[in-house]
Every structure is written in C-alpha cells, then in structure tokens.
Amino acid sequence: MTDCSRCAGTTTSGPNHWSERIRDIADFPKQGIVFKDITPLLSDGPDFASALDEMAQPWRTTPLDAVLGIEARGFILGAALARELRTGFVPVRKPGKLPGRTLIQEYALEYGTDRIEMHEDALPRGARVLIVDDVLATGGTLRAALGLAAQLELEVVGAAVLVELQVLQGRQKWANDVPLLATLSY
C-alpha cells in the first residue's frame, strides 16, 4: 500500500476525455490513502478503447513476443494491450496462484515484503517483453517483474503503466536502460 494522500486534487498530464473517468477514493484501502480507481474507465467501452490505444501507441512498431501483466489490474490492461499489439500475454501473479513450476521474486513494501511469480517456462530465453501494470506508485512491483524477467533471461523492451503517481517517485528507482512510459501522470 502506498500513501497517495498527496495525489488528491492534482491535475493530469493527459489531454484525453477518458482520463476524467479515473476517480479518487479517499481512505481506501486504509485511512489517509487516496486510491486512483480505474474501474469507471474500464466500464466504458469507447473510453477504455481510447485509453488502450494511447497506451499501445508507443509500442506499435516494437517487435514483441509477449506482454507481462502484473496482477490484478495489470492483467486487464496487459491482456487487452497484448491483443492490441498482436502478441502473447504472460500473467505475473501473487504466490500460489499459478500451477506448475514458477520463479519467485521478492520485493519491498512500505512495511515488510511481498512476492510475485510467473511460470518458469512461460517464454524462451531472449524473448522480447513489455511489462504492464495499472499504476506506478513506488515502483516495487514493476521492479520485481523486471527481476522475474531477468531470471528468465528475457529482453525487457520497456514498461507501460496507465497512471503514474509522480509524488511517490517510483520512476527514480527504475532501471535507466529500460523505457518506462506512463499514459497519464498525476
């Protein structure tokens, strides 16, 4: 969980109408946090399509073998983006959710640690992937997905998020040699 109380009321960098569908939910999931809720955007077909089109645009000419989508909202965006980009989709899940053999990557939270995993045979070594999540906050989950990709010796061509919460400075902790694109910033 990240404290985004400082994100409330900020303006967006996105000029598109669809950005108005992302709403602030105060004190969720706990007191003092303002949650950026993308579900109203997801429920509107034309606006969701516009957001996906904008998210896909920078990657349309990039050769890809798959999109790695991070649980849970990264699944929604990642699978839709994979279809848009005509490539495969690989889920990156919380522990114990994937059958078979998996690779695990631990990452730091504000208080403690968590883990994500993916199938160890998800893609062949050297496959070109795009990592996708809904929100870049502190960057821990994205960096963990980058770690999983490194374990599989995948080539990460970039990362894409729908929303970046700039005040939480997740971008400053990101790998400089891997492009990280946010469709919308607060």
From Swiss-Prot:
Q: In which pathway does it act?
A: Purine metabolism; AMP biosynthesis via salvage pathway; AMP from adenine: step 1/1
Superkingdom classification of source: Bacteria
Under catalytic activity, the entry for this protein gives:
AMP + diphosphate = 5-phospho-alpha-D-ribose 1-diphosphate + adenine
Q: Which UniProt keywords apply?
A: Cytoplasm, Glycosyltransferase, Purine salvage, Transferase
Q: What class of enzyme is it?
A: transferase
Record localization: Cytoplasm
Stated EC number for the protein is 2.4.2.7
Q: Which GO terms describe its biological process?
A: adenine salvage; AMP salvage; purine ribonucleoside salvage
State the Gene Ontology terms under molecular function: adenine binding; adenine phosphoribosyltransferase activity; AMP binding
Instruction: Extract the coiled-coil ranges from the record.
Output: none
Read off the InterPro entries from this record. Ade_phspho_trans, PRibTrfase_dom, PRTase-like, UPRTase/APRTase
Q: Name one GO cellular component term.
A: cytoplasm
Q: Where is the signal peptide?
A: none
Subunit info here reads:
Homodimer.
Q: What does this protein do?
A: Catalyzes a salvage reaction resulting in the formation of AMP, that is energically less costly than de novo synthesis.
Family of the protein in this entry: Belongs to the purine/pyrimidine phosphoribosyltransferase family.
Protein name in the entry: Adenine phosphoribosyltransferase
Annotated source species: Xanthomonas euvesicatoria pv. vesicatoria (strain 85-10)
What gene is this protein a product of?
Answer: apt
